[in-house]
Amino acid sequence: HFDYTFPALLVIVLLFSGLLVSSTTIIEEKSSKAFFRNFITPTSNALFIVGNYLSNLLIVLSQIFIIFLALYIFSEAAVSPDILTNLSIIILLTASVFILLGMLIGYLFKSGETSNLAVMSLACILLFFSNTILPLETLPIAIRSIVAYNPFILAADALKEILLFKAPLAAISFQFYTLLIYIGVFIVLIYVVRLFSKRRYVE
């Protein structure tokens, strides 16, 4: 049953690595001696955000590449070229959501301890309210309608549709556009929080 569990395992890796790596990077940046020099430079906030995002994305995607490489070496399971593009898009969107969420947590908290505690708590909540641990059918209808927008569930469902049924993006449009909305919202929140913390730091 590895084909059915692999999408959830892949999202778990994206969840924890994306949240932990990005939040730790932001906390280390805030605690470094160069933090004040970055604030007084004429460089825009957007450039720092994009730089942090791309560096974290490179780390997370490297981990995913190693996972697929090990899967190919030990089981000789290869990804079909027909689904490679769609699979890459969903992985990229999922990694972006969790990385941006981790960056937001890093900007919201001051110390590494509180940031790591918030990251682990949020990751456990997202993992708990998913089909991986708790079947959604056991939840009340009201809670189930809210949990349906859990990015973990959206990503896992999209990956299952692509890996098992070779579904096109049109068949997973709900997951695709919802993940895009998450990315847009997190980018705006990160920019606002960084701008607010910059003004408070300067004052």
Q: Where do the model's predicted regions map?
A:
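Short hydrophobic, aromatic-rich alpha-helical segments embedded in or entering the lipid bilayer
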Residues: L134-Y177
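Transmembrane helix segments
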Residues: F109-Y149
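Transmembrane helix-loop junction
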Residues: E28, L71-Y72, M103, Y107, ...
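Transmembrane helix-boundary elements of multi-pass transport/secretion proteins
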Residues: H1-F36, I40-F65, L69-L71, S75-L84, ...
